Amino acid sequence: MFYSIVAIFVGAGLGALLRWFLSLALNAFFPAVPLGTLASNLIGGYVIGVAAVVFTVRVGLPPEWRLFVITGFLGGLTTFSTYSVEVMTHALEGEFGWALAVAALHLTGSFALTALGMWTARAWLAAA
């Protein structure tokens, strides 16, 4: 149990730090669509696709690795709450086109990158 807690704790901290760094580095470029939040969610979508396949196929991996990557790191990296407030801020300011665009970018992008991550992992594992 102790190692599980540590794995989640460390993973979440690293994921949250990466999200913060991405926001610092990217959000100023295009304020209408905060690119740091988008990058965090898209990267998270890709990584969870890879992780879902790897942890399903490589059943011998210690369970703490799954907790570190999926529960911790990706839980800290991805952010539904920030995405929600960004979409609703546009909507409440009457910018319905931007609200819809931001929502669509996050949802379709994340699904597409999750599928790409799963495909990547399957191809990588098949070649190994």
Swiss-Prot record:
Compartment annotation: Cell inner membrane
Molecular function GO terms recorded: fluoride channel activity; metal ion binding
Keyword Metal-binding belongs to the record: yes
UniProt note on regulation of activity: Na(+) is not transported, but it plays an essential structural role and its presence is essential for fluoride channel function.
Listed InterPro entries: FluC (IPR003691)
Catalytic activity: fluoride(in) = fluoride(out)
Keyword Transcription: no
Keyword tags: Cell inner membrane, Cell membrane, Ion channel, Ion transport, Membrane, Metal-binding, Sodium, Transmembrane, Transmembrane helix, Transport
Main subcellular location: membrane
Membrane topology: Multi-pass membrane protein
Database matches in Pfam families: CRCB (PF02537)
Entry binding sites for Na(+): G75, T78
Superkingdom assignment: Bacteria
Entry's Gene Ontology BP terms: cellular detoxification of fluoride
Family as reported in the entry's similarity comment: Belongs to the fluoride channel Fluc/FEX (TC 1.A.43) family.
Described function: Fluoride-specific ion channel. Important for reducing fluoride concentration in the cell, thus reducing its toxicity.
Protein name: Fluoride-specific ion channel FluC
